[in-house]
Amino acid sequence: MADLKQLMDNEVLMAFTSYATIILAKMMFLSSATAFQRLTNKVFANPEDCAGFGKGENAKKFLRTDEKVERVRRAHLNDLENIVPFLGIGLLYSLSGPDLSTALIHFRIFVGARIYHTIAYLTPLPQPNRGLAFFVGYGVTLSMAYRLLRSRLYL
């Protein structure tokens, strides 16, 4: 079993950790952006969240949907669908001993695609911008999974 010093000396794992931190910070930004949009547009999903803006029927008018809020929320949900698999597969891939330059290409393309996807979603840019960014990031995760299965699980 590798000790902590060996793990910290693993350049691929350290690169993965750096890019994972960037992408998780971006995802946290979207969470904050959703809350910001809800507060500035006075749009809430739960009745108890409206309590500070009125009572009874008056509070219910804040219990609605808004396109700006929903757009940011959908971008955040899309991040959850893509970043979680990247984190799991990327960690296993990093520990499998891949070439540093190949791993960096995977990590950089994924992070770039996800940042571009967020820009394309929030701006909004016309399709196929968002779709291409999604599939590029998804393809990177599939590529890492394939390389991991091929090299370490002997499939």
From Swiss-Prot:
PTM sites of type 3'-nitrotyrosine: Y93
Residues exposed to the Cytoplasmic side: 34-62, 124-128
Sequence positions bearing N6-acetyllysine: K42, K55, K60
Annotated site residue numbers, Activates the enzyme when modified in vitro: C50
Annotated GO MF terms: glutathione binding; glutathione peroxidase activity; glutathione transferase activity; identical protein binding
Main location: endoplasmic reticulum
Enzyme class: transferase
Subcellular location: Endoplasmic reticulum membrane; Mitochondrion outer membrane
Biological role: Conjugation of reduced glutathione to a wide number of exogenous and endogenous hydrophobic electrophiles.
Protein name: Microsomal glutathione S-transferase 1
Gene source species: Rattus norvegicus
Lineage start: Eukaryota, Metazoa, Chordata, Craniata, Vertebrata
